[in-house]
Amino acid sequence: MSDPLLAVEKLCTSYGKIRILRDVSLSVGEGECVALLGLNGAGKTTTMRSILGLTPPTSGTVRYAGREITGWPAYKVARLGVGYVPEGRRMFRDLSTLENLQLAENARGGTWTIARVFEHLPKLAELRARKAGRLSGGEQEMLAIGRALVANPRLILVDEPSQGLAPLIVEEVYRILGELKASGVAILLVEQNALLALKIAERAYVLDSGRMVHEGPAAELAGDRDRIRTLMGMDVSTTG
């Protein structure tokens, strides 16, 4: 078996004296979609930020494409081919959709050009001249994904893409993520909506209070709603 594209081992991260992550380990293979699930405050976003170098871990290791990148600054991690779609869809609100994409575009080029992003996200093409601050929540999520793609990553970390969006828009966002997966881009997907994420992922992890409490096939977990309730303490009877 080949080494994973991303390998996180025994990661511990603190904010001041407060320990957030406790020996978190996970992996993402080349072209694989992996779901990282858990309730608010479980440590999902901190895990992503620790991988990206935005919140350096206090111990443990992060390896990407065989290279240890633990604690590297975020810009160096991005240059290696790691994209990020953050919670809250941060972007330049006073710049147009096109200008946001141009700022994020990889100067070295690659298969994901702005033209290709517009082909896969035709709504963005229609809105290329509109300022990002005037886009709807769903349109901003699509722009955030587009910004990550034009950097031509091998791996994208996607944080809560369904948050605050109407069901039809969520469906469209997940259609786009499915296309990315089919194109060979690896995805680490953080999501509170467990069943939604499990539909697209091959494997799933569950975090609880900064500790990893589950790892296994996504389809297996999706078929056991009692197990999801036990792991996440949530009612999934109508979810997904």
Question: Each predicted region: which residue ranges?
Answer:
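Conserved ABC ATPase signature
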Residues: 131-135, 139
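ABC ATPase C-loop
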Residues: 148-149
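Catalytic Walker B motif of ABC-type/P-loop ATPase nucleotide-binding domains
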Residues: 156-160
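Helix-to-loop junction immediately C-terminal to a conserved catalytic motif
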Residues: 52
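The feature captures the beta-strand-to-loop junction immediately N-terminal to the Walker
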Residues: 37-39
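Conserved ABC transporter NBD signature motif
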Residues: 60-68, 80, 112-114, 119
